[in-house]
């Protein structure tokens, strides 16, 4: 599947194709349905060539870090994603689907992540209830076309670990649960979400709609440099 870029708006905008990678990691159908509602021509695929042609590549994920990264490699998607990022084409990682793009995780220290994004996946500190489940506020700290209107809204979380980018400039939004943690990260064309947009009702639907619109407008892979507020996330990069 292919689609051309477009600068139109609303019904004149070229339809965005979105490939949801199927690698035995959980929420592929709910992610597909949410993207369809957001206006994308979304499809689930285990075929790398089919996925490579899509405008937006989606890596969902629910479960254990080590198992997910193993299934991802066994499905043959590692080279696909590496090429995607090298070409500067849009990619969305959701929950563990975002976490496996990093080098490693406290959840399974022996498992090698894909190491495509700089940073590490850390466990939420022991002085908060883990897992973190339910609705919580997202605070945007850097402008990004994919998160317009998300600041101060509640999204749905279910996790015990979070991605901690090596560079704070990659943090787009944070959640202030406990000492706080990054919940939206951006590294070039890759956007990662710790919350589940497909479970976040109207807020998640709006976020995915904005992302699809940004992909259609050719802006989704742009660097974001406008700092809106201090990050104010505790924990730093200590193990």
Predicted regions and their residues:
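Conserved beta-strand elements of the Class I
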Residues: 19-21, 156
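Cysteine-nucleophile active-site neighborhood
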Residues: 62-135
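Short acidic/histidine-rich motifs immediately flanking catalytic phosphotransfer sites
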Residues: 51-61
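C-terminal and late-domain segments of enzyme folds
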Residues: 163-239
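Short acidic low-complexity segments
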Residues: 42-53
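Structural signature of beta-strand start/N-cap positions in the alpha/beta core
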Residues: 41, 56, 90-92, 154
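Extreme N-terminal starter segment of soluble prokaryotic enzymes
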Residues: 13-19
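Pocket-forming structural segment of enzyme catalytic cores
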Residues: 103-179
């Amino acid at each position: 599947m292919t689609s051309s870029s477009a600068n139109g708006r609303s019904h004149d905008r070229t339809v965005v194709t979105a490939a949801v990678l199927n690698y035995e990691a959980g929420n592929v159908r709910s992610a597909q349905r949410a993207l369809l509602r957001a206006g994308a021509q979304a499809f689930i695929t285990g075929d790398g060539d089919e996925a490579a042609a899509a405008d937006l590549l989606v890596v969902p994920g629910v479960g254990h870090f080590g198992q997910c990264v193993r299934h991802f490699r066994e499905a043959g998607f590692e080279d696909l994603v590496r090429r995607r990022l090298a070409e500067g084409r849009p990619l969305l990682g959701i929950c563990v689907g975002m976490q496996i793009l990093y080098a490693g995780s406290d959840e399974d220290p022996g498992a090698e992540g894909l190491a495509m994004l700089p940073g590490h996946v850390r466990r939420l500190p022991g002085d908060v209830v883990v897992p973190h489940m339910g609705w919580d506020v997202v605070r945007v700290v850097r402008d990004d076309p994919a998160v317009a209107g998300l600041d101060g809204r509640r999204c749905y979380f279910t996790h015990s670990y979070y991605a901690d980018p090596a560079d704070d400039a990659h943090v787009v939004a944070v959640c202030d649960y406990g000492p706080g943690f990054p919940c939206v990260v951006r590294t070039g064309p890759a956007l990662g979400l710790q919350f589940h947009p497909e479970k976040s009702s109207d807020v998640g639907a709006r976020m995915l709609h904005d992302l699809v619109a940004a992909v259609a407008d050719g802006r989704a892979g742009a660097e974001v440099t406008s700092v809106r507020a201090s990050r104010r996330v505790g924990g730093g990069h200590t193990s």
